Every structure is written in C-alpha cells, then in structure tokens.
Amino acid sequence: MTMALSTQRTTKGKAASLKRRHTRVRKKVVGTAVRPRLVVTRSTRHVFVQVIDDAAGHTLASASTMEADLRASGDDKSAKAKAVGVLVGERAKAAGIDAVVFDRGGNRYAGRVAAIADGAREAGLAL
C-alpha cells in the first residue's frame, strides 16, 4: 500500500518537527542522580514513561500502557495515561526518588502528556 505524496510529506514533516522540538527540550532538561528525568514517549495508541539518570545512563523506573493490567482496562487513552503516571510515580518512590525533571519529549503539554504529569504528582513525585 502506498501513501499519497502529500501524506508522505506531512508525515515526514511531523516527525521532523517532533524531533526538532525534542532536541530543543533536551538542551534544557538534564536528569541527575538526585533529580532524574521523567521521559514521556507517546505513540498514537500507547504511552511509555521512563525515569532516567542521565549521568549514569540508567533507567530507574518505567511504566507503559503495554502492561497487562492497563491494556485490559477499557478506559480511554487519557485515563490510561494518568494510570501510567501514577504507576511510574509509585515505582519511582519505591526506588527512593522524590523529585524528577519532566521531559515531555517534544510533545505539547496537553492531553495524555499532562495526564501523565498529573498522575505522577498524585503518586507523590515533585515535578
């Protein structure tokens, strides 16, 4: 199946714009061992969240909508995103992390991205 030429240009333009925005955000947002980076990766269907210590290059906690209990729930995408935020917040607290730097990954701070942040705050993380 081939896409129309105009659709290919639009898709490539959106991906390039997202990468450009993420690069701009990453210049300013750096995670440390004391305050790691909470990274949001969003696809059309799922969201993935990681808490990363950039100094060591390690993932300290993670959660996504691909997990069995969240996948089985019949909630909408925003509700699942909020549940992912709560889950990653609880896992980060269990790992001894109280505060994180929020990295929205080039996405707008609205909808599912904002729901993840709200869920993490509910779990007790300071953003």
From Swiss-Prot:
GO BP term, pick one: translation
Q: Where is this region: Disordered?
A: 1-22
**Compositionally biased intervals (Polar residues):** 1-10
Report the GO molecular function annotations.
Answer: 5S rRNA binding; structural constituent of ribosome
Q: Which UniProt keywords apply?
A: Ribonucleoprotein, Ribosomal protein, RNA-binding, rRNA-binding
Cited InterPro entries: Ribosomal_uL18_bac-type, Ribosomal_uL18_bac/euk
Q: Pfam families given for it?
A: Ribosomal_L18p
* GO CC annotation terms, alphabetical: cytosolic large ribosomal subunit
What's the subunit arrangement here? Answer: Part of the 50S ribosomal subunit; part of the 5S rRNA/L5/L18/L25 subcomplex. Contacts the 5S and 23S rRNAs.
**PANTHER family the record matches:** 39S RIBOSOMAL PROTEIN L18, MITOCHONDRIAL, LARGE RIBOSOMAL SUBUNIT PROTEIN UL18M
Q: Which family is it part of? A: Belongs to the universal ribosomal protein uL18 family.
Physiological role: This is one of the proteins that bind and probably mediate the attachment of the 5S RNA into the large ribosomal subunit, where it forms part of the central protuberance.
List the protein's name: Large ribosomal subunit protein uL18
> Organism source for this protein?
Kineococcus radiotolerans (strain ATCC BAA-149 / DSM 14245 / SRS30216)
